[in-house]
Amino acid sequence: MVLFFVILALVFVLVLVIVSNIVIVPQSKVYVIERLGSYSDTWTAGLHVKIPFIERIAKKVSLKEQVADFPPQPVITRDNVTMQIDTVVFFQVMDAKLYTYGVNQPIAAIESLSATTLRNIIGEMELDHTLTSRDVINGKITAILDEATDKWGIKVNRVEVKNIIPVSYTHLRAHETKANL
């Protein structure tokens, strides 16, 4: 009788291990799989079976277009006018392996890269040209970011400059607000 319960418990544990290692990858996602700590495979949408204790899901990556809205960056134009510019980056993961292992914090890396690129582009322009050339700025930033993020498995679809606000205008608005209080 005891043997029966032991066998029943073993069968139950075996079934539990097998069922817990059946993985369904949803549409528009991929899973990066590591076997014994090193990259093994990238699973696409569908049913997969993971080898217990040998394989693990290292990262679940969305293939949908993602939006990263970055805070305003202080930049200086060629004619030494300081302004605040905030950007929105639309990107998509194209290679889950590179995205997982290419850079430690991809969103933070994109933010730093976009801020540096924005400073370089705006630094070559004068204030008037900056205010009227939003499409040119968007195109240049998109091209530079897309090329730089290729090695991370990321495609930058577009970059939008949301606001271009000269700092003198910001100070004027702050003084108006204080005066109204």
Predicted regions and their residues:
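Single-pass alpha-helical transmembrane signal-anchor segments
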Residues: 2-22
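Amphipathic, interface-forming alpha-helical segments with heptad-repeat character
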Residues: 25, 33-42, 48-167
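General alpha-helical segment detector with a strong preference for membrane-spanning helices
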Residues: 99, 179-180
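Conserved small/polar residues in nucleotide/adenosyl-binding loops
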Residues: 170-179
